[in-house]
């Protein structure tokens, strides 16, 4: 008859608590990693679509602006064509500058891994509250 002894007493409860803490921490890390992977996949798909749409938009806008410039230059009297070319160039450069500044401001408001960072902040706050209570 095999006598199987299970640890009894305070040692068992300490080991059980330690195992539960480790398993909870592993589950938390696993959940956060899964969330980060899902968010990265979504951001990758969104970024690819955005770049494709941006490329097509820039291509069509360039052709449209070239056609518009040709029409404007043909519509103006020959003695004012140079002034018309200067004015259209200035307007286009100003629009490009405004668009560049707008793009930089928008890119600085990136939301990459926003939910993951939020969950990690919640975890940190809960751990800090638990450590203060003890």
UniProtKB/Swiss-Prot annotation:
InterPro entries: Phage_holin_3_6. GO terms for cellular component: plasma membrane. The chain crosses the membrane at residues 56-76, 84-104. It holds the Pfam family Phage_holin_3_6. Keywords: Cell inner membrane, Cell membrane, Membrane, Transmembrane, Transmembrane helix. Residues 77-83 are periplasmic. It is a multi-pass membrane protein. It is found in: Cell inner membrane. Its main location: membrane. Residues 1-55, 105-134 are cytoplasmic. This is Inner membrane protein YqjE.
